[in-house]
């Protein structure tokens, strides 16, 4: 007997809290490396310790949880490794803002005190996202939660750094990097946000040395950097400037002679075809400078203020210097013209300051040898990227990879384990802090002040979290991990680096599969941002609609390679689905009162056609769901379960079974109750990975002995031969098609569902005739018929509306059911409204100014609306024609 009744209305908040606490207390999330079961492991992409749950996190972790719960139910020992990232610059900025509010700064505190302050902040305020992930239902092994700066991971970071240094794969060099003049640190490419901005293109005259009156005109978007020019360049095949190559020009304002070089980098179509080369302030120019052995002249300091190399502009902030340089060029008659010019400008992802290409002494990883193995591992299939289209992006990045700048000029992070000797100048790199120089023995050593790029520790995440460099049971059982679920934006910055580090230090790929999910956008397809005001807060959604509805929405729209357009109306729609499951379960439980499924022998049951059909469809749903999840087609799996639950189980089977449940003899009633119980119990287990809370709540109330203490650890349903009834299923499909046909006639003719009608079924074959005779009770009941005639070559009444289902003609006599005159008026009125809409959409789409200027998705939407109203009109015209035939 059921342990308790379900409440009339589902209240998600209380249910979610209750079951999550139970799951944690019972240890269902914990992974045992010694269990002997086949293993399945996922490492969570560690969210920033400063972060709060956003839609990207919600999608990413919902998909991971679906996989983990599904595999757990399939008998796997599942490890879902959780943790957070120390998020160097982001965390340092949070604490610096706190200090500023207190009237102090990190520099006033000093490094050690500041680091202590950050740890204090982390203990008190950091990691709120972990609690938010729990609200999402994430079944992580929270006892193993890691932090990229905890003791174990810090040890792994130092081990990796030292080994790479000793292998010659880490080095220090003076090169160009992304530099934030406000944060005073190098930035990785992913930490630079590019935005198109309106700017200018200044055309400047550079006098040719030795040829009075001759100039070359150089076009630039950054005239202030000309102070650091060490050449101008032309294309080697540009005949306009062939005679200039090898000559010199005079750099305006500072009057320094610089050479004219020929280089294929120059775009002959851009500007005048002559470009200034500033190797210390432009990445492309840096490469040109290396090819031509040009000087590197840095004219800015760390705050982007002009230094002494900038002569009379020394001490000026870069944009103030730009204004003065342009004014001075104009005064000298060397400014030829200024054009409007839009171009991409890079900004610091934290403080939005315009980033400066900056010449600086930094630490690098020589990634070429590491990238070769990582590239081969995807090409030979050891790691599979899904969707496959992202493999080409991965190949392109890895084949054109550049050495990785790993040093950052901040305080919060893994401090680089390098010490410089003030006595002999040598560098000591060590796993344990040295007290003396390894080269000369002097104690005059000082540690590098830079810390490592946050991505360096993140690159070790799959194995460092499992105890490496020690040989642990976790590594033996769970590495390589089974799957990584992540967004495309960090495919190179994180995924590729994990591949490189995993292969180098573990000699195995870090994961077998990489599933790349799309972005969650707003309903119009725009990226969500605070400035646009279109952000949907996952926690607000969970509070309003419940976690299960939210999770199912994300899964239902998670099609491979297609961004999710999310609107609250869609989540509300899936809340209705949650309520449908709840109400269907309440109906089932009322009819299962006193039922004991454990006493039933399924082999002795006399199954009805409806029973065979729903069992066959259950088999199909189980097989289709498993196939879709194996292929990471989350939307297909969700779609299968939605259709089976709502349409086949709730709308059809429950209605078909009511006759047996209410009016059948004891044997028929017992069979119907058993099938109802069996299908609902299996359905809940099928849905559980997607909707964990409501499924557990209902499952615990079902009658009979449970095979497991929680649905979480019950088996996942599979297709089984004893439920395979293809012939019975095909039979019921025709019955349902006939019922749908009769219902369609009701709808078209505006006959109330409550009003009983008659129907005539003229069958094209003896097989259809016998089939419908066997299932007459279903047709009568679900089509709400007062009379039903089934035969072959039956006469069609003149006043009948007609539908066709297979080889069966359905005729519904309409005499006395429809007021022909009133129905004709109603249809004409509706058609008139649609004509106005069609005219409005037509005018808009015939307007060239709208079609050419409006965004493509807006135009496409208008075309869809036109097609939709046109189709509606066609349906009404067909109904009008039928009505007029009755007159």
From Swiss-Prot:
CDD domains: Anticodon_Ia_Val (cd07962), ValRS_core (cd00817). Its EC number is 6.1.1.9. Disulfide bonds: none annotated. It catalyses: tRNA(Val) + L-valine + ATP = L-valyl-tRNA(Val) + AMP + diphosphate. It comes from the Bacteria. A motif ('KMSKS' region) lies at residues 527-531. HAMAP family: Val_tRNA_synth_type1. This is Valine--tRNA ligase. It comes from Geobacter sulfurreducens (strain ATCC 51573 / DSM 12127 / PCA). The gene is valS.
